[in-house]
Amino acid sequence: MKLTVTLPSAGKGTRLNLPYPKEILRLDNDNALIDNCFNFFKDYGRNQVEFIVVINEDKTDLIKYLAKYKDRYNISFVFQNPNEKEYTGAIKSAYHLFGEHNLVLLPDTLMRLQPGKDLYTLVTEALEETGFSFLVKKEENKEVLKTKGALYVNNEGNVVEYEDKPTDRAEYYNAFWCAFAFRRRNFYECINFMEK
C-alpha cells in the first residue's frame, strides 16, 4: 500500500525572522526540522511512501535541501493556491496529487511515537478501519493549546471537537493534533471539519 505524505511548508515564517525557511532550521549537525518527517519512513522507499511539499515562491532553499532524498522517494513540489489560506489551504492545494491513503505532517512540529511503533503501519491500519484519523498529543496547558490545532478527545479516544488556535475556549480542549490521515474519498469531509 502506498502512503502519500503532504508537508504544508508555504508559511512565510515571519515570527522567527530567519534568513531561510523555518523547515530547515537545524536541530543538530545531521537534521533539520523537516528531516523529522522523512525519518519516520527511513525503513521505506518510493514504492511505499511519496511526498508532496506545498511551498511558496520563497522556498527555493527548501527544495535544494530536500534534494538529498531524491534517490529514495518521489517528492512533488506544489505552490499553495493564493486563493487558499492557512494550512488547510496548503493541503487543499495538493489535492490533485493525493493518493488513496494520505497523511499530513507539519514539518515544524516535532512528533515522537511510542517505542516500537511505526508511523507507516499505524496510519495504513487506521485508514483500513476509518477514513479519517488524528494522531494526537494529550495536553493540559491552555497556553500551549492556544497555539495549536486543539482537540477535545473523549474517554473512548474519539475526537469530538476541533478548533484551530482557540482563544476563548482553550480550557475546553485536552489535546492537539500532530498529524492526520485520510483516505482520498474522505478528504472534503475531513477538511470541512477542520475549517468549521
Question: Which ranges hold each PLM region?
Answer:
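N-terminal glycine-rich phosphate-binding loop and ensuing alpha1 helix
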Residues: M1-L62, I75, P82, G116-Y120
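A secondary-structure boundary/capping signal
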Residues: P8, L106-P107, R183
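Short glycine/proline-enriched turns and hinge-like loops at secondary-structure junctions
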Residues: N17-P19, V144-K146, Y173-N174
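Conserved hydrophobic/aromatic positions in well-ordered beta-strands
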Residues: L25, G149-Y152, F180
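Alpha-helical scaffold segments in soluble metabolic enzymes
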Residues: N36, F40, S93, R185-E189
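Conserved beta-loop-beta/alpha segment of the NTase-like Rossmann-fold superfamily
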Residues: L62-I63, A67-N155
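Catalytic-core segments of class I nucleotidyltransferases/pyrophosphorylases
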Residues: L103, K117-Y120, T124, N154-K196
